[in-house]
Design a protein with these regions (language model features):
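N-terminal hydrophobic/helix-forming segments and targeting peptides
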Residues: 1-239
Length: 239
């Protein structure tokens, strides 16, 4: 896996992330930190050599996303979790503006940078907000109903169940408008809405998003998953 290693725009070094035990059939996968190493594309042989390049603890490693959109509609890339949902929200805002559509209630769009570390939705929520819908990737995998072409409606995650009325209305709208959807439970999942509730906000909450396969790796989704998420978001806030 290729990546640039950087502190700022003026100091970028390239390299690869590679398995120490490259023959997967011959070794137990083990822990990530025990089986992976970062190789710089520079003639370095010691920690001192690396330090002379200006690289130090705390620098970022950003993988080459290798984005591909296939003719059949599949979207393959790193960071679909959660840039794909960000695109959906920006498309929703663009739709409201260009089509001069008035939502049935006041709507705020909050895009955070800290969802993955647990506190993205913990602040900056206006006082008059009564309900919050997190638009985040839906999981695709064994035992789940969602695939890449669907919008996932999450009934429960690691923090517990989402609001029953919100989820029920989402399902009702999806059925009425023939939106491809699945209702799933994600026991290891957390969202910005979870962070808001932990911060003390007394609000109704829901979670929807396009199906994404192989999250936190080289991920795959589909145009239909994004479209179905957009359609459900519009139906819920505008119709």
């Amino acid at each position: 896996m290729r990546f640039p290693f950087f502190r700022n725009r003026d100091s970028v070094k390239n390299g690869i992330l590679i398995s120490i035990r490259r023959t997967g059939d011959g070794f137990h996968p083990g822990l990530f930190n025990d089986t992976m190493e970062a190789l710089l594309d520079e003639p370095v042989h010691s920690a001192e050599d690396v330090g002379k390049l200006g690289i130090m603890a705390g620098d970022f490693v950003c993988f080459d996303p290798r984005t591909v959109v296939t003719k059949s509609g599949y979207i393959k890339s790193r960071f679909l979790d959660d840039k794909l949902s960000t695109c959906i929200l920006l498309g929703y805002a663009k739709y409201l503006k260009e089509e001069q559509v008035q939502p049935k209630r006041q709507v705020y769009i909050l895009i955070t940078s800290y969802e993955e570390v647990g506190h993205g939705g913990a602040a900056s929520i206006p006082e008059n907000v009564e309900e919050m819908i997190s638009v985040d990737m839906g999981c695709v995998g064994e035992g789940l109903g969602c695939d890449e072409t669907m919008v996932s409606i999450c009934a429960k995650d690691s923090m517990g169940p989402y609001d029953y009325q919100v989820i029920s209305r989402m399902v009702e709208l999806a059925k009425e408008q023939s939106i491809g959807f699945a209702v799933d439970i994600y026991p290891h999942y957390g969202s910005d809405v979870d962070a808001a509730l932990k911060a003390g906000y007394d609000i109704r909450h829901g979670l929807i998003g396009p199906g994404v396969y192989a999250s936190h790796g080289y991920e795959r989704s589909h145009r239909l998953g994004a479209e179905n998420t957009f359609r459900l978001l519009c139906a819920y806030t505008v119709a």
